[in-house]
């Protein structure tokens, strides 16, 4: 990391070890310099910056000074790897060896392919969960908005008569105070009428 004397910003440079030394690097022994203030210019630089493990061919593993190439799979190899991943997301050492032998790949290539495939699968699952949560949040937000409108409408209504509700002990029917008063008057009239009838009957008997 170097500080430029004529600049107010830091000139940040990092060195990342490469897999094979390049002749143009001199005595850096396979170290590559990147300015983290700038975006990577090439796909290769981007992979170096994020620390991605490149896919390599075993034919170039022993060639000194030669840059390793990315692994290019055939359609059949890709199909068989996908089928194997569907059955098992993680391979046992024996499964990895058998699959590498069958596909004419190295065990390291198969292992790296499965690592990358698991990472893509996890990322896809996370994106689906995020989309689901966004939709659920939108639904809850809309439901909350409707409830708020209903609350405001209820608050705007004029309060009804504040008559107390009571329950009739005989019929167990809930009535308000006005009904109770009218019922009491009616019951009083009936009792008074019955009393008069009883008195008149007693007088006639005498």
UniProtKB/Swiss-Prot annotation:
DNA-binding region, as residue ranges, is located at 66-125
- The answer to whether UniProt assigns keyword DNA-binding to this entry is yes
Tell me which InterPro entries the record gives.
HD, HD-ZIP_Homeobox_LZ_Class_II, Homeobox_CS, Homeodomain-like_sf, Leu_zip_homeo
Which keywords describe this protein according to UniProt? DNA-binding, Homeobox, Nucleus, Transcription, Transcription regulation
Q: Which domain of life is it from?
A: Eukaryota
* SUPFAM superfamilies listed in its UniProt record: Homeodomain-like (SSF46689)
Could you tell me where the Basic and acidic residues compositional bias lies? 26-48
Region Leucine-zipper: what ranges? 133-154
Q: Where in the cell is it found?
A: Nucleus
Q: Which GO terms describe its molecular function?
A: DNA-binding transcription factor activity; DNA-binding transcription factor activity, RNA polymerase II-specific; transcription cis-regulatory region binding
Disulfide linkage: none
Chief location category: nucleus
Gene Ontology cellular-component terms listed: nucleus
Question: What biological function has been recorded for the protein in this entry?
Answer: Probable transcription factor.
In which family does this protein belong, per the annotation? Belongs to the HD-ZIP homeobox family. Class II subfamily.
Write down what this protein is called.
Answer: Homeobox-leucine zipper protein ATHB-X
**Organism encoding this protein:** Arabidopsis thaliana (Mouse-ear cress)
Chain's gene name: ATHB-X
